[in-house]
Amino acid sequence: MLRQLKSLFEAPAPRPLPGFERRHLQVAVAALLHEARRADYHEGNDEYALARAALADLFGLEGDDGVAVLEEGRARAEQLTSFYAPVTIIKRDFSLGERVRLIEHLWRVAYANGELDPYEDHYVRKIAHLLYVPNTQSMLARNRARA
């Protein structure tokens, strides 16, 4: 009886994501990275390399796996009419720390060509807001990305 009562107040153990859910999360992140790449209407090789690095950092995706997820994310981003679907998946499956890391990667993509376009700035701030990343955390991530 005491054990059951105690279990009510303990945090549940994090459950590993099944393969298909993990893939949806990866594609959602890739779609947001693709949108960051094209926010200034110029998609460069540096931005692509940073998007691949983001997937490697966040999910351990390298090589052909990373390219496939980025391509699937690009296709998904082309069909998006709002950011609701990818943002909902990311909010559900990423902790705050992981969402801050994602925002830092989005800032890196935005700064890939050495300058920040106003459209890129607006995009990353908007996504940070939708992901419930506090503004202070987003700005600290921005400073780390710029350094």
List the predicted regions and their residue ranges.
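Small-residue-enriched hydrophobic alpha-helices in membranes
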Residues: 1-147
